Curated annotation (Swiss-Prot):
Subcellular localization: Cytoplasm; Nucleus
Catalysed reaction equations from the record: 5-(methylsulfanyl)-alpha-D-ribose 1-phosphate = 5-(methylsulfanyl)-D-ribulose 1-phosphate
Domain of life: Eukaryota
One Pfam family hit: IF-2B
Protein name: Methylthioribose-1-phosphate isomerase
GO cellular component: cytoplasm; nucleus
UniProt cross-references to InterPro entries, sorted A to Z: IF-2B-related, IF-M1Pi, IF_2B-like_C, Initiation_fac_2B_a/b/d, M1Pi_N, NagB/RpiA_transferase-like
Family, per entry: Belongs to the eIF-2B alpha/beta/delta subunits family. MtnA subfamily.
Any GO BP annotation: L-methionine salvage from methylthioadenosine
Keywords associated with the record: Amino-acid biosynthesis, Cytoplasm, Isomerase, Methionine biosynthesis, Nucleus
Biological function: Catalyzes the interconversion of methylthioribose-1-phosphate (MTR-1-P) into methylthioribulose-1-phosphate (MTRu-1-P).
A molecular-function term among this protein's GO annotations: S-methyl-5-thioribose-1-phosphate isomerase activity
Pathway annotation: Amino-acid biosynthesis; L-methionine biosynthesis via salvage pathway; L-methionine from S-methyl-5-thio-alpha-D-ribose 1-phosphate: step 1/6
Length: 364
């Protein structure tokens, strides 16, 4: 059974505090929007899909017990609080897209004279809760599509390890599993699907400095699932791809531009460069909500920068010389030219065909 990072029932929300993993499993109560903003900003919850789900559910928890005088006050509350939640971590587009969808819904309900303020509130709560269920279903579809793409690519290239009966070795970066989503995972969902098919020989995960999401979170999930797995340092990727016959790299995404350029956890770009050099397919696994058609290319993506302390300290222990300057971008942008395919719940697309394909899907 996969880990549960989000516990929700109407009026109640708890999140697994990922800052304490793997040493301690502790759930934090989120009582409203201010709590939601804080757990997102402090990275107690992280991963673009999970950020969106927790942000929206924090608003649902806050407004659930409230009685609003009229529909206008409810609409204003929804719009103001959702826009505030977007500011917690601006690089992840999922929260912005979810906020825009819910604000649009609130405006439609406000204009609908057939429903009163109580009905409007419950319709809004229903829509917010539906996002939780949809994320899990989408992740399972991403897993199935990604596993199929990798296995077909391996069969075509003849790259399966000798004696592996078609099983594959894959590399992943950061954390994209149940801890980063409502459940199952995106890139780690692809790994999970390979395992369910009996086609996973081995998975390698990077430590993912400086926050160590790979070492703390992905390794934690892989051990929990009893997958054959090995942790490697970020600086070992080139040697790994040269020595271990890795069939594919699969990573997640915080934002994908319309041309396929992808913002993901810092270190993704260099892995893609190394994969290209070693002729290893490089896949991005992300729901449609991570694709921002309004952004033409990666140069337009805002990159969040994190505090120096995340680089200079591990816990309370300083590991860097006092007085040293630090540059700590949380994400980098991988050019579309380095990406083999973008795995979504609706199929796998080459970056060059992404904008047209997604536009057609959204119109259908």
């Amino acid at each position: 059974m996969s880990l549960q990072s989000i516990k929700y029932s109407r009026g109640s929300l708890e999140i697994l505090d990922q800052l304490l993993l793997p040493g301690q499993s502790k759930y934090v109560v989120v009582r409203g929007v201010e709590d939601g903003w804080k757990v997102i900003n402090k990275m107690q919850v992280r991963g673009a899909p999970a950020i969106a789900i927790v942000g929206c559910l924090s608003l649902a928890v806050e407004i659930n017990p409230e009685d609003f005088e009229n529909k206008k006050s409810l609409r204003q509350e929804i719009e103001g609080k959702l826009n505030y939640l977007v500011s917690a971590r601006p690089t992840a587009v999922n929260m912005k897209i979810a906020a825009d969808e819910l604000i649009t819904l609130a405006n439609e309900l406000y204009k609908d004279e057939a429903i009163d303020v109580t009905q409007m509130k419950h319709r809004f709560l229903d829509a917010t809760e539906a996002m939780l269920k949809k994320d899990i279903a989408d992740n399972r579809a991403i897993g199935a599509n990604g596993a199929q793409a990798i296995l077909q690519g391996v069969a075509k290239a003849g790259k399966a390890p000798a004696g592996s009966t078609g099983s594959v070795r894959v590399l992943t970066h950061c954390n994209t599993g149940s801890l980063a989503t409502a459940g199952y995972g995106t890139a780690l969902g692809v790994v999970r699907q390979l395992a369910e098919l009996g086609k996973l020989e081995h998975v390698y995960c990077t430590e993912t400095r400086p926050y160590n999401q790979g070492a703390r979170l992905t390794a934690y999930e892989l051990v929990h699932e009893k997958f054959p797995a090995t942790l490697v340092l970020d600086s070992m990727v080139a040697a790994l791809l040269r020595a271990k016959n890795v069939a594919a790299v699969v990573v997640g995404a915080d934002r994908v531009a319309s041309n396929g350029d992808t913002a993901n956890k810092i270190g993704t770009y260099q892995i893609a460069v190394v994969a290209k050099h070693h002729d290893v397919p490089f896949y991005v696994a992300a729901p449609l909500t991570s694709i921002d058609l309004a952004i033409p290319g990666g140069d337009h993506i805002i990159i969040e920068e994190r505090p120096d302390r995340e680089m200079t300290h591990v816990g309370e222990h300083r590991i860097a010389a006092p007085g040293i300057n630090c540059w700590n971008p949380a994400f980098d942008v991988t050019p579309a030219s380095l990406i083999t395919g973008i795995i979504t719940e609706r199929g796998v697309f080459k970056p060059a065909e992404l904008k047209e394909a997604i536009t057609k899907l959204l119109e259908s």
